[in-house]
Design a protein with these regions (language model features):
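A residue-level detector for the "anchor" residue at the start of short, highly conserved motifs
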Residues: 1-76
Length: 76
């Protein structure tokens, strides 16, 4: 059975909330304006690192994952 995640016109705040529940991580977003951005996409049974790499490229941010706390900083 596939574990597909589908997002249709969801705010990044909702996307991060979903990822938090699914992967047991916490998001620390330094620039809160990013949370209002909209995302549409599908992830097919991917791990949190793969998903974050896609989001990083799409939204031009850097992130670090330390002990389940993912800190996100927008690139200047």
């Amino acid at each position: 059975m596939k574990k597909e995640l589908v997002f249709r016109s969801e705010t990044l705040e909702n996307v991060f909330d979903c990822l938090s529940r699914k992967f047991g991580v916490t998001f620390n977003v330094e620039d809160k304006s990013l949370l209002d951005d909209i995302y549409t996409g599908t992830f097919d049974d991917e791990n949190i690192e793969s998903i974050m790499k896609v989001l990083k490229m799409h939204y031009n941010f850097n992130y670090k994952n330390e002990d389940g706390i993912i800190t996100i900083q927008l690139n200047e």
